[in-house]
């Protein structure tokens, strides 16, 4: 895939659209309880990008931020509720984008399972991926 290529994405209702410039920094499944609850899923697949490679195309008045914990926030659409983004002090200069909100494919497949100590037993796991407990 072409480095510096831009790919688009957005929320379920289309009120918020964005573009991210490749390359991505990483891609991983997050099993933490907050991600599971924010998305109503067994885990969430995130792709990390440099923050200055994220461009909001439309919906700045629809994109809202929820402080999910000290030093972390989640971006969602105020119309449809889609959680699309995550930023944290722990990863300065990065914007994490929920892979399911990106239209098409990015430049890599998931490489790891993060916060694996919190995974749910009913979700099948790709055991070939690297595992991180936190």
Annotate each predicted stretch with a short phrase.
Residues 1-134:
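A short Gly-Trp-Pro
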């Amino acid at each position: 895939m072409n480095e510096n290529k831009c790919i688009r994405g957005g929320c379920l209702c289309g009120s918020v659209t964005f573009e991210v410039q490749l390359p991505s920094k990483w891609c991983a499944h997050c099993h933490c309880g907050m991600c599971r609850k924010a998305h109503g899923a067994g885990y969430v697949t995130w792709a990390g990008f440099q923050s200055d490679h994220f461009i909001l195309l439309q919906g700045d008045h629809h994109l809202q931020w929820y402080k999910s914990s000290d030093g972390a926030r989640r971006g969602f659409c105020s119309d449809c509720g889609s959680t699309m983004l995550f930023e944290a002090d722990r990863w300065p200069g990065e914007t994490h984008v929920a892979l399911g909100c990106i239209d098409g494919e990015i430049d890599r497949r998931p490489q790891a399972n993060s916060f694996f100590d919190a995974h749910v037993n009913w979700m099948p796991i790709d055991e070939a991926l690297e595992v991180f407990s936190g």
